[in-house]
């Protein structure tokens, strides 16, 4: 637990919280440590790193632990608690003791790229995980940190006279499943939703003098995200349309063109996928209707009723108040 906020405080209380330094000296708790992009970290905020140090400097202070979500290459769908903390991917500030969850300040430091998957809008690239209620949890996203939802796939074009299929839904960036978390996005840091895929185009038909011509619709474009949405397949079996193009991290893919049967029957084009500021388009309609565009994920999601404090000096693109985390 955090140390008391007033009255007499003993050296043994300080040692119980922060661990025993080699000299058993108050002065040896003047530490300045860098972890990832976090530099000059004191033992806890307000404890001196040099100069005079006194017992009252430790009032209300607690052990600080940085969870490592900054080392290595890109990752997908990771929980700070389950995947990192539980596997000891962390740094205890000061280095005087082993990790301790109860009452500690847990700093989840993100300074690389994380992506989500495409299976559910609630799925997040990074989750805080659930912690002891006495712990203080903050997420610090450094200048190279990116937390990105996945883009939805484009819908398939209508087959012959069939309707186009809807585009896939984008998924989400940061998931908060601990109450009272503070999120700090530093300059250059990014949290971004994944965006929906475009709908597939509808099939077309033309009849005259015993002729019955049909044409399939084009596939929808993929939504922006990481991973990005794939372009939708065209309808087939009649005059085939074209596939939609895939998106990338920031830009949506285009819908594919509809099929052309003898310049008489025309399938409709697929819709463009979604990107920040532009919702995914539905597929065009011919004799059959186009599929709807997929919805967007959220930049930040939280469990219902949870409070989150957001300090943003970087970039957050997408809804910050969506509920439901998985």
Task: Report each predicted region and the residues it spans.
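Glycine-centric low-complexity repeats
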Residues: 2-326
């Amino acid at each position: 637990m955090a140390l008391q906020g007033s009255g007499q405080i003993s050296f043994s209380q300080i040692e119980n919280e922060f661990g025993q330094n080699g000299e058993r000296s108050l002065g040896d708790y003047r530490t300045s440590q860098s972890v990832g992009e976090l530099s000059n970290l004191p033992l806890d905020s307000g404890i001196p790193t040099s100069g005079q140090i006194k017992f009252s400097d430790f009032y209300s202070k607690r052990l600080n632990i940085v969870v490592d979500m900054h080392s290595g290459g890109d990752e997908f769908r990771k929980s700070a608690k389950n995947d990192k903390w539980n596997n000891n991917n962390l740094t205890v500030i000061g280095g005087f003791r082993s990790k301790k969850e109860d009452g500690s300040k847990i700093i989840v430091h993100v300074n690389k790229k994380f992506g989500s998957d495409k299976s559910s809008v609630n799925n997040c690239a990074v989750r805080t995980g659930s912690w002891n209620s006495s712990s203080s949890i903050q997420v610090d996203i450094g200048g190279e940190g990116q937390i990105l939802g996945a883009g939805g796939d484009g819908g398939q074009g209508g087959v012959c006279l069939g309707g186009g299929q809807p585009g896939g839904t984008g998924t989400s960036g940061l998931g908060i499943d601990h109450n009272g978390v503070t999120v700090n996005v530093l300059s250059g840091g990014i949290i971004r939703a994944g965006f929906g895929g475009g709908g597939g185009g509808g099939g077309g038909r033309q009849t005259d003098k015993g002729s019955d011509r049909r044409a399939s619709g084009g596939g929808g474009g993929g939504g922006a995200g990481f991973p990005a949405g794939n372009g939708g397949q065209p309808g087939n079996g009649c005059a085939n349309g074209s596939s939609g193009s895939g998106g990338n991290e920031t830009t949506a893919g285009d819908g594919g063109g509809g099929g052309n049967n003898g310049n008489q029957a025309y399938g409709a084009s697929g819709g463009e996928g979604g990107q920040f500021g532009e919702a995914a388009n539905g597929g065009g309609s011919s004799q059959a209707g186009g599929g709807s565009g997929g919805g967007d994920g959220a930049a930040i999601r939280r469990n219902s009723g949870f409070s989150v404090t957001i300090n943003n000096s970087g970039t957050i693109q997408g809804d910050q108040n969506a509920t439901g985390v998985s």
